[in-house]
């Protein structure tokens, strides 16, 4: 048990039910601008890897670490920063993360070698973690309680739109400039979002306990090693490396759970996972994003290598899913303010399972419409699920634990996507060109399991 914990008390600070409209709209602009930048930078670096490898005279395998270090730094620190936000204020973590992200973007743009770029990308990942770890917690305090579902819907809309436009924006920038501009473009937006945030973000309640630094190291090590292990498996690294990383992750997680068994606000939120709705909502989130990871890794290979479509056509075929998610996100938010998330999420994931199964049994020479409507069904199901589930997860946690709940939202998303990508790689290793169909069928299974867990929320208490 940690020694740096004071007696647990209720969170202190202002109690309010959202911001007035005039201030709320500016606060929304601030947090969603930062979220857009952090989400875009997760996607656009992939497009720039060939140019980075050529310009810095490194191999493609080495250049991949530009993506890896960002993801590891991001995932490893989500829970510690979410927990720290409960103590010092979510708005401070957001502003500090945005400042670091903006400065690190300048460092990326000025990088002169792979090593300097990796350092800057690591710092950028830490900054993005500061933004993402408290983003949904801030939404909870910015919107009135009667509109919080809409707020989460807008949040999902921003992420889906960034996910949709990321490759297009990156390709457009690279068509007229060099890869450093992909990072330099963050500077004006980061400065504007920071200035607006300083004026408009609400002060959030402060928890009365000390931050457990050793627990933060354990949490970062646990999640970081898990991502390294899963990612190494996806890239067919040596089995001993994968096994050692995953075992070390489990050991650190076990130590963290033992250390925080009696903690009033544990870094790994064991107290929240004792709430059935929170636990089921987290599990369904991991399942749904694993489906997304399976689909978005396997489908491009299927379209290009099996159907022999061009890269442009592949991009067109991939668009309906995130596009429909972006359309459905605010609609799902409004519905989640009126209807139970268990029903909405269960129906959405059932629809996603149907869409994935239909993609898995595509005919040998499908027409454009045959592909597009199947992708649209997947997007409809995913969008119908995402916002109500986020609302259920956040609402099942007390306001004083919003930071940890927000960290879990982002961690579940990135963990699910990583697991899905690793399983897709495994499917291709086992089945060759049939790997895409196997991955899609596996995704349908994940969605079906998630649907059942979502409906189970109707039978449990808060």
How should these model regions be labeled?
Residues 75-76, 106, 160, 164, ...:
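Hydrophobic/small/kink-forming positions within alpha-helical transmembrane segments
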Residues 48-77, 116, 307, 312-317:
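Extracellular/periplasmic helix-loop-helix junction of adjacent transmembrane segments
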Residues 83-214:
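Helix-loop-helix hairpins in multi-pass membrane proteins, especially solute transporters
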Residues 52-53, 84-85, 169-177, 230, ...:
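Interfacial helix-cap and linker-helix signal at transmembrane-aqueous boundaries
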Residues 1-40, 54:
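Cytosolic juxtamembrane N-terminal segment immediately preceding the first transmembrane helix
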Residues 187-205, 220-232, 248-263, 450-458:
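C-terminal membrane-cytosol helix-exit motif in multi-pass small-molecule transporters
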Residues 25-40, 45-47, 60, 135, ...:
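12-transmembrane solute porter fold
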Residues 55-57, 89, 110-116, 177-178, ...:
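Helix-breaking motifs and short loop linkers at transmembrane-helix boundaries and internal kinks
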